Amino acid sequence: MIKLKVKKGDEVIVITGKYKGKKGKILKVFPEQNKIVVSGINLVKKHTKPTKVSEGGIITKELPIDISNVAHVDPKTGNPTKVAFKFLEDGSKVRIAKKSGEIIGKEGK
């Protein structure tokens, strides 16, 4: 299994497929399947029957997409970028945008 460079809450942009060019935040990560759920991307409508607990109707929800179809958004420019890892002076490991060098998020020690 490969090391994932994405985390829940990261801002990503879709680079291929039907939703190409759209941005969203990661809601859920499935590392064993290399898939993620992004807000507002890959929406489907599901018809549900009424039960004692909930009403029936049409529910719109996001389905997972492959990690290879998205790229991180550069915090400085807003464009797609690749991610690299870097160690800071205090020993913490952070993810940085390769294009601008901006820190994307902290990994912890």
Swiss-Prot record:
It comes from the Bacteria. Signal peptide: none annotated. One of its GO terms (biological process) is translation. SUPFAM superfamilies: Translation proteins SH3-like domain (SSF50104). GO terms for cellular component: ribonucleoprotein complex; ribosome. Pfam families: KOW, ribosomal_L24. HAMAP family: Ribosomal_uL24_B. Part of the 50S ribosomal subunit. One of two assembly initiator proteins, it binds directly to the 5'-end of the 23S rRNA, where it nucleates assembly of the 50S subunit. One of the proteins that surrounds the polypeptide exit tunnel on the outside of the subunit. This is Large ribosomal subunit protein uL24. It comes from Rickettsia bellii (strain RML369-C).
